Amino acid sequence: MVRARNLAKRFGDKRVFDGLDLDLPPGGFLLVTGPNGSGKTTLLRVLAQLAAPTRGELVLPPREVVGYIGHEPLVYRELTPLENLTLFARLYRVPERGARVGMLLERFGLWGARHDRVSTFSRGMQQRLGLCRVLLHEPELLVLDEPYNALDGAGAELLDAALDDLRGRTFVVATHEPRRVERLATERVAFA
């Protein structure tokens, strides 16, 4: 569950958002839209517990069960996808690591490149690998900031299918492509 009451975030004199109320039940899907610089990323960072609100009440799941992907996927470019996911699976204490890693690499079309250095990947392939990393530990709350960023048509379709498969989990998604996830949204926040 995600609940916010009178949530506010400021940077000095700049008000990013103020008086925000949210009620997102387990399994809900919050779609966050708005132009660049409107506060989408700041809100997502607060909900992912990477930044503190300036004011307000906030009820969130424990940090260990939150998965977050920002504009830049957190992956090690000098490693292979297999090495990246195996490392994160150990850190997250994922049971049956090999099977989980293999399934995610296959799901996101990276199995054939599992032994290639991430530094040779396109931005879209790195984004898909970042999504694999986020999904490794099967988080209860997924906070995705522009997950379609840099994905080509095939990559976007793979993400669409993954989001459909993950219905029942709680999502907060900011995107400039709301049409891709509109069908999943149960709640909306639109920044001006």
Regions found by a protein language model. Give the residues of each.
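Catalytic Walker B motif of ABC-type/P-loop ATPase nucleotide-binding domains
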Residues: 142-146
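Hydrophobic anchor residue at the start of the ABC signature
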Residues: 131
